[in-house]
A protein has these predicted regions:
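Short S/T/G/P-rich N-terminal loop/turn motif that feeds into the first structured element of a domain
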Residues: 1-53, 61-68, 92-95
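C-terminal structural segments of small proteins and small subunits
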Residues: 60-91
């Protein structure tokens, strides 16, 4: 199993409806991406967030599934509108 973690800082001026859309669309990836076993995403509640407002964890069956996720059309469609709005960080590891 491979764990994909991410956190976002929103760029200035991003409206709440876009933030909510991001959460909904990330959750909606489940069932569309082969090998994506579980998706958890939510608004950060930690006082130690260093400005990261949204975080998530995705569990993939293996590295091949994680690699395929990166180029999957559904993921790419999400990234097309989301990337200009965020400052992201990602960490992936085998579990």
């Amino acid at each position: 199993m491979v764990i994909h973690t991410f956190a976002f800082r929103w760029k200035a001026g991003v409206p709440e409806n876009q933030k909510s859309r991001a959460v909904a669309e990330i959750r909606g990836l489940q069932g569309h991406i082969p090998g994506l076993l579980e998706t958890l995403v939510g608004v950060n509640i930690s006082p130690r967030s260093q400005g990261y407002e949204l975080g998530g964890v995705m569990k993939f069956s293996d590295r091949t599934a994680l690699d395929a996720y990166g180029g999957h059309p559904v993921h790419q469609k999400l990234l097309q509108w989301l990337m200009p709005l965020i400052d992201p960080i990602e960490v992936d590891f085998e579990a």
